[in-house]
Amino acid sequence: MKILIITVAGTSSRFSESLGKDCLKCIYYKNNIKESLLYRMIYQNTDFDCYVIVGGFMYDELNQVIENDFSELKKKIILVKNSYFREYGSGYSLYLGLKAIINMEFSQVVFAEGDLYVDKESFERLCELKTNVITCNDEAILASKAVAFYYDVNYGIHYIYDVSHNVLEIREPFTGIFNSGQIWKFVSSDKLKESFFSLNEVEWQGTNLVFIQRYFERLKREEYTMIRFKKWINCNTISDFERI
């Protein structure tokens, strides 16, 4: 079984502010639903057996859109409600998404943050690969908005991010640094489950990078592939969305 998890629970505060009204950015469009980030992500590749969508902010509106505009995939979609989207970090949405499928038999899980637009060619390649995948993009690494990862001298992966968007700090020698593409692929169900159950309640309430770090630190360099997106847009504002 192939599973895609998309987390869209956040309040979209910067997007709503730029638009002048409350809006769940993953379902925003100007002319039709096919322009929305959620539609674009799901229809990048419809070969998944299951789509897990974790919502929170404007959950009823999300549910209605799925009922009305994703009816042909409705049997494949699991919609999960995150009631703590204001109190907890992004890790809790990932926790709920993984919890929904943790007892299933799966061969691969792709996890994507729901505010992204990426090029179809790169995403399809990610889906076709039989290995674990981390992703990066070509944007400048700025503390004000970037999630970065670097390789230490032994090619171990380390993710770095400042929730206050002030500074990024690396306190050890490193061999490379990249701007994260915020989409990952997991092909080891055993390591995924080990990583899932190894985190405590407080850790899950932080960022989703805690789980990502826990999973990929269990892998050797030859056990994963890195894909660089040819086009990658993190749609924080309406101006970002209009770049698509």
Where are these regions (language model features)?
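Active-site glycine-centered loops adjacent to acidic/histidine catalytic or metal-binding residues
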Residues: 10, 115, 237
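Acidic donor-binding segment of Leloir-type glycosyltransferases
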Residues: 57-78
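Conserved beta-loop-beta/alpha segment of the NTase-like Rossmann-fold superfamily
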Residues: 74-153
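Conserved core of the sugar-phosphate nucleotidyltransferase
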Residues: 119-203
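Conserved alpha/beta core of the MobA/IspD/sugar-nucleotide pyrophosphorylase nucleotidyltransferase superfamily
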Residues: 4, 174-244
